[in-house]
Amino acid sequence: MPLMGSIYVGTSGLQTSNNALNTAAHNLSNIETAGYTRQQILQGSKFYNTIGIASVSNMQVGIGVDYTKCRQVRDEFLDASYRKENGRSSFYEICSESTQEIETLLGEMEGASFKESLAKLWTSVQELQKDPSSSITQGVFIATCSQFLERASAVSKGLNDYQQNLNSRVTGMVEDINTITDQIFELNNKIQKAEIGIEEANDYRDKRNYLIDQLSSKISIKTVENANGGVEIYAEGSPLLIGDTVTHLEVVANEDGFYDVTWGALYDFQPVYNFHQTVSSDFDTDTGELKSLLFARGDHVANYSDLENYNFYNYGTPDTNDIPIASSIVMNAQGQFDRLIHNMVTAINNVICDNADNSSKTGSYEVFTRLGSARYDAAGDYIKEDISKSPADVSTMYTISNLKINPDLLKQPTLNSFIKDDKSVDFEKATKLMEVFAGIGQVRDLNQPSEVYVDAAWTINPNLNSKHGYIAFYDSVVGQMANVGSVYNSIVSSQNATVSSLENSRQQVLGVSSEEELQNIIKFQNAYNASSRYINVIDQMLEHIITTL
């Protein structure tokens, strides 16, 4: 090779080594940058000049080294696995958070547990049974009933407020998903423009990958990179970002004021989720924070009527996309708690008013009255509860939101005197009241067309067979929530370990190691020095030839 050509070989070594040094320094400077991916230099030979042809091969001379590519070091399999498990972890974190919040509401309200109000009511019933005709025991009983209803209303309000909090978080989550999708779309355009030539838009790609990681925690996604370098995103099996088309999620309020998440007008407001699907890791249907928020929240304020039918409780209404009560943490708690209150107040009312004469069939004698309906109609007949219109119309139902203490009894607690027509004390009714409270015996169900008596003990939901009295009923509700919460906590711990393991595996591939980059700097610096010395030697040879000649 001519000496002048050899200078170009040395120059290419200088340039390539300098670029490699810059890349290693760039890696080191971003070692703490969130989402940064290690960049790696690929070097190769420049093209060869053919200077002759020998009998066995071409006679070629190389012209140096070439800076082939600056690539990101990533593992697509680890990325996909991390994003799926990250979404699953977010799903169960919401479940765990919801159960903890409900445990707090059920177990503790303003420093006093709801169970304490149950115990006080039980004590007042026992004292009433000892001396039913006493104005003192009757007054204490009514006062305790009033305190009990206040505490029950406070717990119910807490559940409803938390449900509304989840509802507002749904809108925020949808906005976040749309914002992230728009940002990814913008980065797609920047990457495609930057990579039209031979450039590598690695920093843009880092930002995009970081956003995709964030998006994966909010909604189940799958990504595909097209030939132009843009990323296509499918959310819940439907296109979210394809080419120049970005599909925004939209929230639409249902008749109960809760937000449904849809694909917007472009897809006729079709729902994003099928809530009648089984939520399971086997089907990959337990992924994404948004989905978990919707399931935990439910689609309406539940009450005891939602627990009357096994199929509706577990599977929802056929040919609709409503959320089954059993699948919703908040609605399940609302329904079970309201069932406890409903069964208690109707049993107390029915025991006290069961044998009432016509003069008392005005509702004045029942302890718990309905806000939207009297106990009896003008003919003196009991106004039955109509649950078919729930939750839109609960005016005839003995549900927490439609209850108050009989104002006449608050003024004069002795209206129910527990005195028979023969002027004797009605110990039988007081004893019956105590037995019913303890879950013993039967109580009349006035909603039936004929005189029907049902057990004074109830199951907490249609999936369980064991029956409980009121205090045991409440303990079962709290215990069930604690068990569910424990399961979710275990899943969250397991998922966090899985996500952490996958992230560690990813970092071993894409993460920046300061020791490795320092070794690269030393290596490329030595290569730079070698190229420099090579040029110096060629320079000295040229100088010697020129001066000698």
PLM feature spans:
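Structural signature of extracellular appendage/secretion-system components
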Residues: 1-549
